[in-house]
Amino acid sequence: MPTVLYAEDDRDCRELFAFTLRLHEYNVYEAINGAQAVQIVRDEPVDLVILDVRMPMMTGYDAARMIAGEAPHIPIMFLSAKGLQREVQTAFGCGPTVVDYLVKPVSPDQLVGRVDQVLQVSRTAGLEAVRQESLAREENVYVQR
């Protein structure tokens, strides 16, 4: 069973998505801030990290930089209400293991579908393939606006 770490300071959002991931047979660790997320990655086997951007103690950006440096094999996704192009660029600039950026609102089924896809592609084609697909999708979104 794949293991996902979901770091989100909003309790309702965190519990909803963690519950949904568990229903789809994922093991889920929950963190309420970036510092806790980094510590979980250090202590536990994790297949994917999902980070909110704005969290207390340590932002998702800072956590992503640390995780990418310490665990370069773990893909990182952002799930945030912040959807400006500069925020997406900042997220992808946190390291080569940042493979996706989803803008809330996202339905639980959309999140699970993207988690499934990221894990499948990263296992078969590697993190860079997932990252390039996500970057192309983001670029297309901003071109259409």
Feature names for model-found ranges:
Residues 11-29, 96:
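Two-component/phosphorelay signaling modules centered on CheY-like receiver
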Residues 55:
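Receiver (REC) domain active-site loop signature in two-component systems and cognate sites
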Residues 62, 83-102, 109, 113:
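Alpha4 helix (beta4-alpha4-beta5 surface) of REC/receiver domains from two-component response regulators
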Residues 105-115, 119, 127:
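C-terminal output helix
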Residues 121-145:
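CheY-like receiver
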